[in-house]
Amino acid sequence: MAFSKFGKMFRLPTIEIKKKTKQYNHLQRDVNPNDMWEIIGELGDGAFGKVYKAQNKETGVLAAAKVIETKSEEELEDYMVEIDILASCNHQYIVKLLDAFFFDNKLSIMIEFCPGGAVDAIMLELDRGLQEPQIRVICKQMLEALQYLHSMKIIHRDLKAGNILLTLDGDIKLADFGVSAKNTKTLQRRDSFIGTPYWMAPEVVMCETMKDAPYDYKADIWSLGITLIELAQIEPPHHELNPMRVLLKIAKSEPPGLDQPSKWSMDFNDFLKKALDRHPETRPTAAQLLEHPFVSSVNTNRPLRELVAEAKAEVMEEIEDNHEDGEDEDPADLTPVQAPTKDPSQTSATSLNGDHPHGTCYAETSMEIEEEPSTLESTKTPLKEQEDNLSDKFQVEDHDKPESEASGKASSSDSGIEDGKSTPTSEEDTKTVEASEPELPVQRTPTPAEEPEYPSETMEKYLEKPKEPEKEDHCEETQPVLKRIQLKDPNGRMSVVSNRSSFAGDDAESLVSHTNGRLSNRYSDVASDSMDISLNLSGDLSVNKEMGTISLRDSKKTLKRTRRFLVDGVEVSVTTSKIITDDEKKDEEMRFLRRQELRDLRLLQKEQHRSLTVLNMKLKEQREQMHRRFDQEMNAKKKYYYTELEALEKHQKQTIERMETEHSNSLREEGKRIRVEQEKAYQKFLDQMKQKKKEVKQEVEKMPRNQRKDTMKMKMNNYQQMRSDEEQKFIADQKEYLDVTLKSIISKNKHEISETERQCLLKKQNLVREREATLWDMEEKNLHERHQLHKQQLKDQYFLQRHQLLKKHEKEQEQMLHYNLRMVELLKARQQQERNRLPKIQRNEAKTRMVMFKKSLKINSSGSAAEDREKVKQFSRMEEKRQKAERLHQQQKHENQMREMLSQCDGNTRELQQLQNEKCHLLIENETQRLKSLDEQHNQQLKEWREHLKPRKKVLEDELTLRKRAGAFLQDDG
């Protein structure tokens, strides 16, 4: 029985805790979401949980189900901010909350499903940025959504392409309010360091180390500008930097812009300039930006409908294996690329209207439009002009560098990351063809029998342009590709517009010679002066060992993607070709690793934000406790003095009443005593009168009898008159004495009472002075205590910030270490590939050079066969020496590369340490300044309080003096 009672006692608190569980308006507890929603697929993996595609079992409505593992009520409260924001928002361009469940320690948030997907995923799928009309529509819709959010006192704080979803109707939906803030007033400021680094505004970045400069809703305007750059260039500014290291770049550098501003409209550039204003005070609001010419003219969302249609189009993929056995083949022929490109803001129009051919130097694009019959016109251009146009507008890339796919709709930059750094396409990388320029000659593809062979001189001119200084830095990588556009003629036949070149024999040799001629001098010190033919051959078939490329084609695969979709009843077919290399896999791996770093940062931010929230709640509770304690002490002191005053007044009243009673009694007793004495005196007076009467009678009796009667009568009349006068006088004297005596006693009593009242008044005033002095001392003490508490709380906040910063620095160093290891491993792998490839290259070269040397001996032979054999042996020995020198050179090159890589890694580590030290120093400086400012503020507050104390004392003394005078006046009147 006893144990059961104890069990009940111990179970009671648990029951009470369950009853106290906080209830939320928009969250269903203990309801299994699987009873109402069916999971039909997985959409992705977010920073805090997985996202599934779900369908309502009753209505069939689709939703994106965000499932988050939630371990405590505190974590649940963090996620409730997003749920409350979504529930309170009802806007065309903001995702809607359909349901929210908390079941089995899992939070399930059902959000409106957007079939178009996220914009960043669309850009990766199409391998290009968006065109300007599409960016305009997205920008306008985002501004309208932001205007609504800001009017609802909500700061999104995480705007980016990944949080912009598209519907099939061509509308956007802002999503992911996980780090958003809901304020109580529009101009409320925040100091939380939260968001994704690349899109953070400078004032948000500064909150990492400076909490005294909070930000407001205009931080979203900066993120909007960065997002527009991301839409145009696939990646945000500074994307080549580590997520942890980009923060200092944002804080110190000038506002970013487009990599190639000339390729975009002036309105776009001006819009970005206004949105990316470093000063939040002058940064425009969403309502002001809606009046900007960049978005004010947008009245349709057709560009987004086209984008969604292309992204959701049926895709047919075909992989072509380009493997060729290098040992059995002739030197590879490099086909010049006919790939005029267009401005990124014009590319989508090309894909839909088919007015101009376009593409890039490394992607094969085929576009097919089935609408109205079209004819194919061929313009005749002199060969020299063709060569100049081609040499100006085409570039050749190397085999072994990573290629980034260019879709049939864009000449996009490389969105991948090589060696952890971006390789964006600059103006030198990809030339564009403006609409005003004449189009390149269009040639029908000849049959194999009539396929023309370009003269070697023509091909030399094709490949001499990349040797120019401004091209070498950007066009060292060459890639043979074919540009093809397919159009249907009126008869329904497919015409293929292409530009092909075939090389054979000496033409190929001449082409290779001119392509790699700039590298021929590298090995000139190996051959003997007497071996001129050997030097010539070495120059003709030199190998680009620096870049690890060869003159023969490597084994590669080409991925062809064909998309077919309808736009306003027009069927559009876009074919893109992309050469698959190992480097692309590395780029994808680097992209994945960077996403992982961002995810780690997001988790770290969330954890830090939660810790900071817990600390702020603790500090707030401390302040409230101190305030309550101060109020309690103040009220206790006031109550004490109020009680003392009441007791003093009560004692005074009782004393006065007692004195009055005593005085009344004494007055009554004295009056009674005097009256008794006066009665006795009166009796004595009467006795004296009687005695005098007797004396008169005796005197009359002594007289003769005949005189007695008249004399008696006369004497008695005189006696009666004298007695009456004496009696009246005696009584009057007695009365006067009584009155004087009583008045004297009353006056004495009044004086005693007034003196007592005066003493009590002095005591009361002294008590009031003591009370006010005590309260003033308590106020001053409270000021000091409050200052000390604020100071300690500030130190606690900065201690947590330092702890979080050190934790973040450890994460940065860990990521930097992994990054450096990845770079070293990639370099080792590449060098191993080059070492493995070099023997094969040398065998192929030796075989080809030997064949050519023997041919030259046959042509120029002037000696015997023995001499020719000796020359062949000598040539073989020279080849062996040359190959040995090449291997040695490669080894030295690899060692230099490794040293440079290790030096670069050390430099990265030192730079990171320097940045971290700067952050720590900045945080310490800011803490010192805040503490100093807090001390100055306290001193100023104390000074003002003391200045205000003097008039308060004077007012009190004046009031007490007035009361004292009033009491004295009343006493005088009394």
From Swiss-Prot:
Topological relation to the membrane, as annotated: Peripheral membrane protein
CDD domains to which the protein is assigned, alphabetical: STKc_STK10
Coiled-coil features, chain-numbered ranges: 605-729, 870-950
Intracellular or extracellular location(s): Cell membrane
Gene Ontology biological process: intracellular signal transduction; protein autophosphorylation; regulation of lymphocyte migration
Region (Disordered): 320-479
UniProt-listed InterPro entries: Kinase-like_dom_sf, PKK, Prot_kinase_dom, Protein_kinase_ATP_BS, Ser/Thr_kinase_AS, STE20_Ser/Thr_Kinases, STK10_STKc
The protein's name in its UniProt record: Serine/threonine-protein kinase 10
Species assigned in the record: Danio rerio
